[in-house]
A protein has these predicted regions:
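Structured, helix-rich domain cores that form ligand/interaction pockets
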Residues: 1-292, 306, 310-378
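Helix-turn-helix DNA-binding segment
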Residues: 293-304
Length: 378
């Protein structure tokens, strides 16, 4: 049993036409931030619900934009969807993007690991192999520190090492994954009753230790491919606030960024057996990190090739073409910066929708544009 929740939600928004209503109080603070000149604490019926920072200091940022951070206790309330939509719509705050999102799952232990310390031991002794990034940080009781180029370990050696925290990714990573002992955090920092109440309502046993597996998404450098529609989805409020869509989103992050395998010594680690740590087997979404340059890595080529193979089977079975899907494939390859590769590999199989020919025509148009005189040439 695990409970999926939102633990951080910051919304990039247009507040240029903001008009606070009578039910909401926007209390302006006497200070701002390094990025925004103005800061407001927002209250609804006397309850503090959000912080709005706006009025960008830099001219490079769009005028009238800001960041709306929903306070942590609000994120665990039952009618979160209505609360956020009312806050934005009633006060004329327009959604632009999600600047930071932390999704978490709380549980008592991983499947197969009633003693969570055994999970840490199996990882550190390579009995479990994590697919993907190999740099990590492990923490236990803060007494002794050990550093090397690949990880930092903080712990106390007594009768055994007791680990409380494991992180993959850095503070600047577009996606970071954290596993930590939430019960220990309550002991060390502060107990949050509203989280404990959510546990009790969802059969999370607080008499045992409760662990949290959290994924933090920052900026707009990650998109999601809907594997049913083959369409791209950016992060949006429906995806986050609707419980069903939120679970699909979390499942996608778990399958991509918490992929552990039972190490049987195979050279190809991705062929080793999955370690089923949580009862999550599939998601209709697939996360893809956007680097900002032409993306030509092997994983994305494999994804496009898999789509092409599936489409071949559909065409053979139905003896007909799907122009909508073909257009989506074209859009996908352009989005990933793989038009030339796709045209060379698959262009010949399209009779009257020749991707190779289209790519060549686009190259010729770009060449013509490059030699056209500009205002500076005249």
């Amino acid at each position: 049993m695990h409970l999926v929740s939102i633990d951080w939600l910051s919304i990039y928004c247009d507040c240029s036409a903001m008009a606070p209503s009578k039910d909401y109080i926007f209390d302006k603070e006497p200070y701002g931030t390094s990025v925004f000149a103005d800061m407001y604490t927002i209250y609804l019926y006397g309850e503090e619900i959000a912080i709005l920072t706006c009025n960008p200091r830099s001219s490079a940022m769009k005028k009238g934009t800001g960041v709306l951070k929903i306070l942590n206790p609000i994120l665990y309330q039952q009618f979160l969807y209505e609360q956020i939509w009312n806050l934005m719509h009633i006060n004329n705050i327009q959604f632009l993007n999600i600047s930071r999102l932390d999704l978490c799952a709380d549980f008592n232990h991983f499947d197969g690991y009633p003693d969570m310390q055994q999970f840490f031991q199996d990882f550190l002794t390579l009995k479990l192999w994590k697919i993907g990034a190999a740099k990590y940080k492990v923490c236990a009781n803060k007494a002794v520190e050990f550093d090397c180029n690949y990880f930092k370990m903080i712990g106390l050696q007594s009768s055994r090492h007791t680990y409380q925290y494991l992180r993959f990714g850095s503070k600047v990573s577009k996606v970071s994954a954290y596993l930590y002992n939430k019960t220990q955090e309550f002991r060390d920092v502060k107990r949050k009753n509203y989280i404990a109440e959510a546990w009790a309502a969802n059969d999370i046993d607080e008499k045992q230790e409760v662990w949290r597996l959290e994924f933090s998404l920052k900026g707009d450098g990650i998109k999601f491919l809907n594997q049913e529609t083959k369409m791209w989805q950016a992060k949006n409020l429906d995806m986050v606030l609707d419980p069903i869509q939120r679970t699909q989103l979390y499942n996608a992050l778990y399958l991509k960024y918490w992929d552990f395998r039972v190490n049987d010594g195979q050279k190809r680690k991705d062929r080793m057996k999955h370690a089923a740590l949580l009862p999550i087997e599939s998601s209709i979404l697939r996360p893809v990190v956007i680097t900002g340059s032409d993306i030509t890595d092997r994983e994305q080529k494999r994804m496009i090739s898999a789509i092409e193979r599936t489409y071949d089977e559909v065409r053979m079975k139905r003896q007909t073409r799907n122009e909508t899907l073909e257009a989506s494939i074209q859009e996908l390859t352009a989005f990933c910066g793989l038009r030339k590769w796709h045209a060379e590999k698959y262009g010949a199989k399209y009779a009257d929708m020749d991707f190779a020919e289209q790519y060549q025509e686009e190259e010729e148009r770009r060449e013509i544009d490059r030699v056209q005189p500009t205002l500076f040439d005249q």
